[in-house]
Structures are given as structure tokens and as C-alpha cells.
From Swiss-Prot:
N6-(pyridoxal phosphate)lysine sites (modified residues): 284
Keyword entries, A-Z: Cytoplasm, Phosphoprotein, Protein biosynthesis, Pyridoxal phosphate, RNA-binding, Selenium, Transferase, tRNA-binding
Modified residues (Phosphoserine): 14
Binding site for pyridoxal 5'-phosphate: 75
Organism annotation: Pongo abelii (Sumatran orangutan)
Cofactor: pyridoxal 5'-phosphate
UniProt-annotated stretches for the region Tetramerization: 1-44
Subunit record text: Homotetramer formed by a catalytic dimer and a non-catalytic dimer serving as a binding platform that orients tRNASec for catalysis. Each tetramer binds the CCA ends of two tRNAs which point to the active sites of the catalytic dimer.
Entry's Gene Ontology cellular component terms: cytoplasm
Classification via InterPro entries: Peroxidases_heam-ligand_BS, PyrdxlP-dep_Trfase, PyrdxlP-dep_Trfase_major, Sec-tRNA_Se_transferase, SepSecS/SepCysS
Family: Belongs to the SepSecS family.
Gene encoding the protein: SEPSECS
Substrates-to-products reaction catalysed: O-phospho-L-seryl-tRNA(Sec) + selenophosphate + H2O = L-selenocysteinyl-tRNA(Sec) + 2 phosphate
SUPFAM superfamilies: PLP-dependent transferases
Protein name per the record: O-phosphoseryl-tRNA(Sec) selenium transferase
Length: 501
């Protein structure tokens, strides 16, 4: 509805009513205009009517939605199912062109605009979350692992001699396989135990750089967000090493946007040293479906190079999901979620601490990890290994997702590399433990229900252990009685034989 349409409507309905409707529409259009002008996340979230109006206006700019369109190419945005078309708000052409994921498509102005706005909003949120000097970023329709691979492949052209990636160990398969998939040899740097925490071995990293030679190292691949007792890598010190030796630095920041501590580490690393790109997951940080990531960095031209490395067009779904989410929340809504996550972390920490003490266990002291917590399972592990894994199974069958039990001595082979003590980020962690994390969107009732179910599971495992111990004791006692009876029989037999002779 434009001005002429409203004027025509005044001949059918009272002009006063039409003008009122026109003003109501203008309030929606005002929000859309501010978004296009500023390219920033609105402070307050939009309602669904504004969002749907905006998406509809964008969609009708794509050629597949033109009323008189005649498509004779091999890819004309045709969709067989109306349900599929509605699911995607009729954005069918995707984003980017064959040479650049950020390029504008001539036949899809609306989808191209959607892509640009989504990238702009995400950049604004990254700054809001703590990385104030980030220069550029883009949404890529791949999860974190493949997005890291794209970064490594972009660096390959800059460093033709390189064949190694230095990687402080974190027991998570996708980030390890991202290096293998890119065709490089991971050089695993074992972590060092400091108290309960597993921290970056900076001396080992620098020694390996000197041993292999900077020209033969593609990059250092560090990590922020991780499962306790591992903590975020020493990003500032690693960034200085990278700057001193002229080595690129790629950071796996999978679920770090929600943590001010992780974002501060990235900001400081870029300030004192070198960070080329940092990658974060969309689903873990923005509560959207799995399948998207954000590649960001402090050098605009390098981030553009990564975008140009992506082959072909790409799905617009992750960009659409995060755009809708951020416009619904607004910057104030996202800030509120970050604040609530911090509060839930403290609450979860206190509740696990109380429960662990009730079972003669303890909450591991990992102050450098702002998201994940770990509780020892020493008393279970002392009896036998099966009790630890049994606890994990019991939690899962009771609909507790996300909690991990980590037994001692687990061995796992990933892409031909064998890791001892897999899941614990080190070969020989002192004890078995259970992980839980306070991620964005967690509510107090989630924590309370988890603690209640964990308590029940621990009681059940302890009860079973006690029963097994009693059974074993009874069996041992029976064997002892049988042995004593046999000895007594032998003594009596010897006595009888002596008397007979």
C-alpha cells in the first residue's frame, strides 16, 4: 500500500479511518527505514507483524516472485511444494554468487539485501558482546567445523610452504577434523595441569614453532569456549607469539559470543598481538537451528578473501534465521539473555557445589572457564569404571541432555590420530568427572530439574554399588567358611589316621 493506494481507499472508507491505517503502517515502515539506514540491531525487538511485513517486502524483490517473470534458465527459484516456499518466506535464490558468498545477485535483490542486513546486525552484536574493534564478519551456512576449514583453505594460498597447524589440545572432534579436511597435519600441544584447570602450554607452543619453522606452520588454532576442566586458551600470549613469528592465528570461538570473558580474550589478543579470524556458531550463541556460523576478524580484506573462497551460492536459511531472531530480540533483548546466562552460571555452580558435597565429591575449581563446570566422580570411580558410564546413561534416559560423564582412560581414534584420556583434554586427568554448562537460554527450572534428577541417579548408582559390595562380601564369607570346613575335615582325617596307626 502506497500513498496512491490509500488515496483510492478513501473513496471507499471514511478518510479518517484510512489515514489512521496509513499512520499505523508508517510506524512499521519507520522501523524498517531506520534498520536500512543504520544497519544496526534495533534497541527494542520488533513484533511479528513488522517482521513479516519486512520479509514480505524483501521477498517480492526477488525475480521468482515477480508477477510477470519468465524464467528460462537452469535455476530460476522454482519450488515444487508451497509448504517449502512458505517455510523460506519465498526466499529461494540463496545468497552470494559463484565467486563470492557476499556478492549481490542481480535476480535476487531482496535475498541480497537480507544477506547484507544479517551480516550488519551480527557485526553489531559481536561489538555489543565485547569485541569492539572487529572490522568485518559474515554469516556462512556451515557449522563451526567446516567454517574453520574454509579459513584454513584461505590461508593455504598465502602460505604455500605450510603443512602444519599448531593446536592446543581440546577433545572435540569437529575442530580437529577441520584441520584434516583442509589437508594439514595437526600438531597437538598437550595442556598443562594447574590446580584443577587444564591450561595452554605456552613453552611447548613456542618450542614447536621454533622446531618446525614459522614458514611451515599455517597457523596456530586456539580455542576459547570449552568443557571444564579445560579453560580458554591463553589468547593474549598466543597472539603475541603469532605476531612475533609472523604466523596467522585462527580462534575457535564456537559458543564464546555469549561469554564476555571469551570475547574480552579475543579483543585483548587482537590488541596486543595477532588474531586473523575467529569463528562462532549461530545455534550455540543465538538459539537458531544448527547449520550456520559467523566468520569474523580484524582485517576487512582477509575476511573478504575468506568469503570469496566459498565455492558457489549458499543457503540463505541461517542468515534468515539469525536476522529474524535479532530483530525479534533487539539489542536490549540479547543483552538481557547474556545477563541471565551469567546469573544461571552462578546458580548452577552453587547448586552443583552443594550436591557434590552431599556425596563426598567436589566442584572442580575452574575459575577461568566462564560457561562449563565439572564435578568429581571419585567415589564412583573407586568402585569400578562401569559406575561412571552408568551414571551418564541414567541421566540420558531421564531426559537430561548436555551433561557429560568423563571416565578415566578412554581411548579414541580420530582421523587416524589416537587420543588417550579422550574427552578429558589430557592423557591422565586425576579423576573421573561430570560436566554441565550454563549456556544462553538456560532457565532456573532447568537447573533445578537437572539437580533433582542427578541426585536421584547418584542415589541409585550408590545403592547398586552398595548391593554389589554386600553380595561380594557374602560370597567371600561363604568361600572362607568352606575353606575352614575343608581344613577342619583334613585335621580330623589326620587325627583319625594317627589314632588308627
Amino acid at each position: 500500500m502506497n500513498r496512491e493506494s490509500f488515496a483510492a481507499g478513501e473513496r471507499l472508507v471514511s478518510p479518517a479511518y484510512v489515514r489512521q491505517g496509513c499512520e499505523a503502517r508508517r510506524s512499521h515502515e519507520h522501523l524498517i527505514r531506520l534498520l536500512l539506514e543504520k544497519g544496526k540491531c534495533p534497541e527494542n525487538g520488533w513484533d511479528e507483524s513488522t517482521l513479516e511485513l519486512f520479509l514480505h517486502e524483501l521477498a517480492i524483490m526477488d525475480s521468482n516472485n515477480f508477477l510477470g517473470n519468465c524464467g528460462v534458465g537452469e535455476r530460476e527459484g522454482r519450488v515444487a511444494s508451497a509448504l517449502v516456499a512458505r517455510r523460506h518466506y519465498r526466499f529461494i535464490h540463496g545468497i552470494g554468487r559463484s565467486g563470492d558468498i557476499s556478492a549481490v545477485q542481480p535476480k535476487a535483490a531482496g535475498s541480497s539485501l537480507l544477506n547484507k542486513i544479517a551480516n550488519s546486525l551480527v557485526l553489531d552484536i559481536i561489538k555489543l558482546a565485547g569485541v569492539h574493534t572487529v572490522a568485518n564478519c559474515f554469516v556462512v551456512p556451515m557449522a563451526t567445523g567446516m567454517s574453520l576449514t574454509l579459513c584454513f583453505l584461505t590461508l593455504r594460498h598465502k602460505r604455500p610452504k605450510a603443512k602444519y597447524i599448531i593446536w592446543p589440545r581440546i577433545d572435540q572432534k569437529s575442530c580437529f577434523k577441520s584441520m584434516i579436511t583442509a589437508g594439514f597435519e595437526p600438531v597437538v600441544i598437550e595442556n598443562v595441569l594447574e590446580g584443577d584447570e587444564l591450561r595452554t602450554d605456552l613453552k611447548a607452543v613456542e618450542a614447536k614453532v621454533q622446531e618446525l619453522g614459522p614458514d611451515y606452520i599455517l597457523c596456530i588454532h586456539s580455542t576459547t569456549s570449552c568443557f571444564a576442566p579445560r579453560v580458554p586458551d591463553r589468547l593474549e600470549e598466543l597472539a603475541v607469539i603469532c605476531a612475533n613469528y609472523g604466523i596467522p592465528h585462527i580462534v575457535n570461538n564456537a559458543y564464546g559470543v555469549q561469554s564476555s570473558k571469551c570475547m574480552h580474550l579475543i579483543q585483548q589478543g587482537a590488541r596486543v598481538g595477532r588474531i586473523d579470524a575467529f569463528v562462532q556458531s549461530l545455534d550455540k550463541n543465538f538459539m537458531v537451528p544448527v547449520g550456520g556460523a559467523i566468520i569474523a576478524g580484524f582485517n576487512d580484506s582477509f575476511i573478504q578473501e575468506i568469503g570469496k573462497m566459498y565455492p558457489g551460492r549458499a543457503s540463505a536459511s541461517p542468515s534468515l534465521d539469525v536476522l529474524i531472531t535479532l530483530l525479534s530480540l533487539g539489542s536490549n533483548g540479547y543483552r538481557k539473555l547474556l545477563k541471565e546466562r551469567k546469573e544461571m552460571f552462578s546458580y548452577l555452580s552453587n547448586q552443583i557445589k552443594k550436591l557434590s558435597e552431599a556425596y563426598n565429591e567436589r566442584l572442580l575449581h575452574t575459575p577461568h572457564n566462564p560457561i562449563s563446570l565439572a564435578m568429581t566422580l571419585k567415589t564412583l570411580d573407586e568402585h569400578h569404571d562401569k559406575a561412571v558410564t552408568q551414571l551418564g546413561s541414567m541421566l540420558f534416559t531421564r531426559q537430561v541432555s548436555g551433561a557429560r560423564v568423563v571416565p578415566l582412560g578412554s581411548v579414541q581414534t580420530v582421523s587416524g590420530y589416537t587420543f588417550r584420556g579422550f574427552m578429558s583434554h589430557t592423557n591422565n586427568y586425576p579423576c573421573a568427572y561430570l560436566n554441565a554448562a550454563s549456556a544462553i537460554g538456560m532457565k532456573m527450572q532447568d537447573v533445578d530439574l537437572f539437580i533433582k534428577r542427578l541426585d536421584k541417579c547418584l542415589k541409585a548408582v550408590r545403592k547398586e554399588q552398595s548391593k554389589e559390595s554386600d553380595d561380594n562380601y557374602d560370597k567371600t564369607e561363604d568361600v572362607d567358611i568352606e575353606e575352614m570346613a575343608l581344613k577342619l575335615d583334613n585335621v580330623l582325617l589326620d587325627t583319625y589316621q594317627d589314632a588308627s596307626s
